[in-house]
């Protein structure tokens, strides 16, 4: 869901924030929160995926893709779709899982990754920067990288189901339960030409 990004951008003083999410559950959650806020806020969520957005829209100052890239069967197509949403000079903020390695390295799990069945590609940072340049982005750069910790992502009284600790090798938290490198998240910025 894109809830937190929509609200944080409103608090940063943006004039209009539009999120997209193909999951009805997250759209309804957003609408409930907006309704209880009790005032008209310049933020909305459309119940669609990026593939349903108009092609070559070139309308947005900033586009966020947070935790989406590794769920896409074609990361190159996703990067192109993101670029085509941005106005000239607009900024992409992309957060995704990465693996260590030189340019050209990408983990393509044959089965699950951290118990997730829908993880297709985990590039190295240099590989993702190369993909961004190939898709026409200017000045792509990584601005943060960190290994996800079990203190950050954990079960709580409010979230009682499985969490990161259940997805990691119990004897070696540097690996997933399947033996892959543990989740490392990186944030990238780039501009549309």
Model feature map: region roles:
Residues 48-63:
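A short acidic, Gly/Pro-enriched loop at the edge of an enzyme's catalytic core
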Residues 98-119, 132:
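Short, glycine-/aromatic-enriched active-site segment of Class I SAM-dependent methyltransferases
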Residues 138-167:
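Conserved catalytic loop of SAM-dependent methyltransferase domains
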Residues 23-25:
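Conserved SAM/SAH-binding beta-strand->alpha-helix loop
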Residues 76-91:
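A short glycine-rich, Lys/Arg-flanked "PGG" loop and its adjoining helix->strand segment in the class I
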Residues 38-52:
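Conserved SAM-binding strand-loop segment of SAM-dependent methyltransferases
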Residues 119-142:
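Short alpha-helix
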Residues 60-75:
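A short SAM/SAH-binding and catalytic strip from SAM-dependent methyltransferases
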